[in-house]
Structures are given as C-alpha cells and as structure tokens.
Amino acid sequence: MKTGLFFLCLLGTAAAIPTNARLLSDHSKPTAETVAPDNTAIPSLRAEAEENEKETAVSTEDDSHHKAEKSSVLKSKEESHEQSAEQGKSSSQELGLKDQEDSDGHLSVNLEYAPTEGTLDIKEDMSEPQEKKLSENTDFLAPGVSSFTDSNQQESITKREENQEQPRNYSHHQLNRSSKHSQGLRDQGNQEQDPNISNGEEEEEKEPGEVGTHNDNQERKTELPREHANSKQEEDNTQSDDILEESDQPTQVSKMQEDEFDQGNQEQEDNSNAEMEEENASNVNKHIQETEWQSQEGKTGLEAISNHKETEEKTVSEALLMEPTDDGNTTPRNHGVDDDGDDDGDDGGTDGPRHSASDDYFIPSQAFLEAERAQSIAYHLKIEEQREKVHENENIGTTEPGEHQEAKKAENSSNEEETSSEGNMRVHAVDSCMSFQCKRGHICKADQQGKPHCVCQDPVTCPPTKPLDQVCGTDNQTYASSCHLFATKCRLEGTKKGHQLQLDYFGACKSIPTCTDFEVIQFPLRMRDWLKNILMQLYEANSEHAGYLNEKQRNKVKKIYLDEKRLLAGDHPIDLLLRDFKKNYHMYVYPVHWQFSELDQHPMDRVLTHSELAPLRASLVPMEHCITRFFEECDPNKDKHITLKEWGHCFGIKEEDIDENLLF
C-alpha cells in the first residue's frame, strides 16, 4: 500500500502543475507568462499549497459540474435520447477509470524522460535544484488526481452527448434540405462549429511536446479547454436546433400547402380535360350525325336533280336524234351529220375520181373526212351510252309500287332492246359508210341489210352559211355554198342542165370580161410572182404554225426568202416583173414545181386534170379572168391532161430545169 501511495504521489506531482496553469488562463492557452509566476512562487508551507490546490480543484469541479448540468438540461428536451445519455455516462465513467489507469502507467514510465512544460520553464528561468521542484509537484498530488478524474469523466460525457447530437442534427437537416431558410441556418451552425473545432486543433498544435514521445501531460492539458469548447458547442448546437425546428415548421407547412394546391390544380385540370373530351366527343357525334343527315339529304336531292336532268337530256337527245326526211319518216340526226360529212366526200368522189369539171379545190381531204366520220360515230356511241345510263338510273331511282315498277321495267327492257337493235344497225351502217365514198351532193346510207349506197343530199341539211361562202355556178347562178350547188346538181342528174352545172368561181356571180391575147401573154408573169409570194407567206407562217411546209420545202424556200435581191410582193408593172424574172430566174423555178405538186393530189400521177385545176381556177377567176384560157393554152394537144413539162413551158421554165425530184 505504501508503494502504491508513493506511486500515486509521484503521478500527482507530474499532473498538478500543468492542470493549475491551464485553469488560470482565460482563453485555455497556457503561456510562459501565466505558468511561470505560479511555479516560481515556491510555497514555504505544504499546508498552504494543499489548500490552494484544493480550492482550484473545487472550482474546476464546480465549473465542470455546472456545464454538465447545463448541457443535461438542454438535452432533456429530447426525450428519446435520455436513456442513451445515461448509458453514455456510465460507460464514460468506466472508460474514465480505464484511462486513469492507463495514464498512470504511462506517467510512471515517462516520468523521468518526459518533463512537463512547467518544468521546462522552471529550468530556463530559475536556478533552484530539480529536487525542490519535484517536491513541489508531489505536494499537488491529491487535488491533481481528483481534478484529472473528474475532467475525464466530464469529457467523456460531453463527447457522448455530442456524438448523439450530431446524428440528430444531420437527420434533421436531411429532412429539411429543400428549404432555403433552413439551409442557411444549417450553414451558420456549421460555421459556428468549425471555429470551435479549429480552435481546438490550434490549441493542440500550439502545445509543444518533444518529438518521438507520447506525452500524456499534453493530452491532459487540452482536456479542460476541450470540455469548455464542447460545452459551448453543445449550447450552440441546441440553440441552432431550436431555431431550425422553429424555422422548419413554416417551411414544412408551406410545402404541404403547395402540395395541396398543386394537387388541387391537377384535379381541376383533369376535370377540365375530361369535360373538354366529353364536349369534343359530343360535338364530333353531332357533327357526324349532321353530316350523315346532310349526306342523306344531298343524296336524295342529287338523285332528284340527276333524274330531272336525265329526263331533260333524254327528251332533248331524242329530239336532236330524229329529223324529217324526204319520205316523211324520221331518221336519226347523227346519221344526218354523217351525211353532211359525206356530203363533201360525195362531192369529192364525184369530182375527184370521175374527173368531172367541178370545184375540187374545196373538197375536204380524206383524212378530214375520216376524222369527221369517226367523230360522228364517237358522238353517236356516247349518246347511246348516256341513254342507257338514263334508263338504268330511272330503274334504280324509282320508288313506285312493285307491280307498276315491274311493268315499267318490262317497257324499259323492250325499249332498250329496240334502241340497242337500232343502235347496232346505226353503228353497223356508220361502219359500212366509213369505207364507202360518195361524190359531192350525195350522202351514204345503208339499207335494211346494212349495205351502203349513195343518195342525193337535201339542200336543207347543208350547214348554215355565211356571205363569204357564196359561190357562182357555170349557169351564172349564185349559190349559198358549194354544198347547196352540188345538192342541186345531184337532183338535176340525168339532165343536160345537171350535167353542165359546175362550180365556176368563189363569190357571187358577176360579169367576167373576155380575155385578150395580150392579157394571155402577161398572165404567166403575174402568175409566177403570185406563186413566189404565196411561198414566202407560208414560210413566215410556218415558223409560228408548223405543218404548212415540210423540211425539204422549207430549205428550198429559205434560200429564196433570205436572198436580198428578191422582189417584194406588190402591184408591180409588167416590165418590172419581166426584168426580175430574167435577172432572178432561179427564184421562180421551185415555186412553179411546188404549185404542180399541190394540185396533183387526186390522183398523184404527175398529170393534172381539169378537176384538179378547178380549185385554183375557182379562186382566181374573179381576179384573173384569163385563167380559163391560160389552162387551155397549157394543153396544146387537147387531151385534157397537163403534164409537168407542159406545165413548166406555160410558165417559161426551161426544159433542163424541169425536174420531178423537186415535187416533194
């Protein structure tokens, strides 16, 4: 026991001096100035030293107990952490005892080799021997040990409470992280904690110790300021927690209100969307119903209108299709149209192949006749199809009783059969007349067996005329048109008058003077110049309207057209025309050949007949009254045929320049 007490006394002397020095300082930072005076004033009596130590220990204990009580009062608000705090106190006491024993062991080992800060200051400032200082330290043994034990216990308690406080604060901050105000307060609390921690670290760094040694005296020096700092930190934490709780309550309430408001808005939006969808669906259904009603009404209206139009078209088409004939019977109008088309064909057939002396210049070409006939056939077929559709629509659209409807169907079927048979006969007749040609004044008509034959055309069936369509016949009579003239000729067929009646010239009949010999000599000069000017006009018109001249013809005319020496069209005197012919002979060679090829069409046998010359004659007689005598002079052998050589000689073309290769 004595050895144990002695050992404790030695430990007390080691711990007494720095503990007293720490308690005397206001900022928990011992310096040489604060420690040195206490250590330099060596007491004369042991009793005084012991009393002073007791007083300081009692004050330290009172301070630490007061802080512990304050922290426990602040922590009593949290009921959930009381039990853990009590357990922490008991465990901290046990840990404090263990720490005391460990510190005793360490102090016994390092006592001789680890002088404290107080002894270092004494060595530097005082000249007293080491034994006196050690005796002074031993005087402060008991109070040092007690104060050390109490400080360890209080430190462990405060650490437990701090460790419990920190997770509570952390969880509290996590729950209120969305609030900006609570975040600012949390940052402020952290800033308040950081200086305390940094101050503690600075204190630990400022307390010197020798390198390579584990000095427990330095740890004990820092324990009391740590208690003070930890207690202060706990007060700040509790205050900040109270502030955070108070500040978080309105933010939580506002957040709940916002959630409720958002939820209410969302419900309103959902309700409004549902209402809009219902309204849209109802509107769509109404629109569909209205469109259905309108479509039904439109269908009925359209059916009525179409039926009305079809009946009107039927009556009009039937009226147009039927017309009176010479026999008093009614014949289809479209057949009469074909007759009109064949009218010209008949005239052409009369005057063309049979070469009767008539006006062949105005006979339509075969292509024109065929196109006209095809058009009439297509029109006829279209009318028949429309009539069939009208009958079908009438059958479908009727809403009459069943018996009457069946009777009407029977009538319609019989009518359709009759019309179809008539239509077939008409189509067959039209097809047979397509390849059958009649001379002018005649029309093609098929008999009951479908065989085509030519009949005379009624002048009434000729198309409407204009004043410019008038022609003059050889009987010196003016006719409304060539159709009327040749229809009259057909009726007079078999008589002398009918045989002699021909188309003399275009226009109304007038007095034609007799051609003299001098005029016959001058006629070829005017005729050559006229043919040349006609080609120039066709060349100019062909650039805008293709089809007048082919490529070879254009190349030939181009040379004449671009020649600067060409005599322009005009009323020139005979002397000028003769001089130009001699000077620019080559410009007149091709126009003479071109006119022969234009007249040699029915047939193209390199020979011109009177019928082929008739178109040119009829157009020139009113201006050139010598044209008839000129054509008579061109046929010296009087065979009624004019060859290319005879034609060339009449126009003064040399025999070596007459070439059939120019007939293209």
Swiss-Prot record:
Compositional bias ranges of the Basic and acidic residues kind: 62-84, 96-105, 120-136, 216-235, 306-316, 401-411
Chain sites annotated for binding Ca(2+): 635, 637, 639, 641, 646
Residue span(s) of domain EF-hand: 622-657
SS bond partners: 433-444, 438-454, 456-490, 462-483, 472-509, 515-626, 634-650
Biological process according to GO: regulation of synapse organization; signal transduction; synaptic membrane adhesion
Extent of Basic residues compositional bias: 170-180
Chain positions covered by the region annotation Disordered: 28-360, 388-426
SMART domains: FOLN, KAZAL
Domain Kazal-like span(s) in chain numbering: 450-511
Keyword flag Nucleotide-binding: no
InterPro entries on file: EF-hand-dom_pair, EF_Hand_1_Ca_BS, EF_hand_dom, Fol_N, Follistatin/Osteonectin_EGF, Kazal_dom, Kazal_dom_sf, Osteonectin_CS
Compositionally skewed regions (Polar residues) per UniProt: 85-94, 146-156, 188-199
Residue ranges annotated for the Follistatin-like domain, each copy included: 432-454
Region (O-glycosylated at one additional site): 25-34
Keyword list, A-Z: Calcium, Disulfide bond, Extracellular matrix, Glycoprotein, Metal-binding, Phosphoprotein, Secreted, Signal
Subcellular location: Secreted, Extracellular space, Extracellular matrix
Coiled-coil intervals, chain numbering: none
Annotated Gene Ontology cellular component terms: endoplasmic reticulum lumen; extracellular region; extracellular space; glutamatergic synapse
Phosphoserine: residues carrying this PTM: 76, 84, 92, 171, 272, 358, 365, 420
Gene Ontology molecular functions: calcium ion binding; collagen binding; extracellular matrix binding
Tissue: Highly expressed in lymph node, brain, heart, lung, skeletal muscle, ovary, small intestine, and colon, with lower levels in placenta, pancreas, testis, spleen, and thymus, and no expression in kidney, liver, and peripheral blood leukocytes.
Glycosylation sites: 31, 40, 44, 116, 169, 176, 196, 280, 331, 398, 412, 476
PTM comment, free text: N- and O-glycosylated. O-glycosylated with a core 1 or possibly core 8 glycan.
Signal peptide coordinates: 1-16
Family of the protein in this entry: Belongs to the SPARC family.
Protein name from the UniProt record: SPARC-like protein 1
Source organism of the structure: Homo sapiens
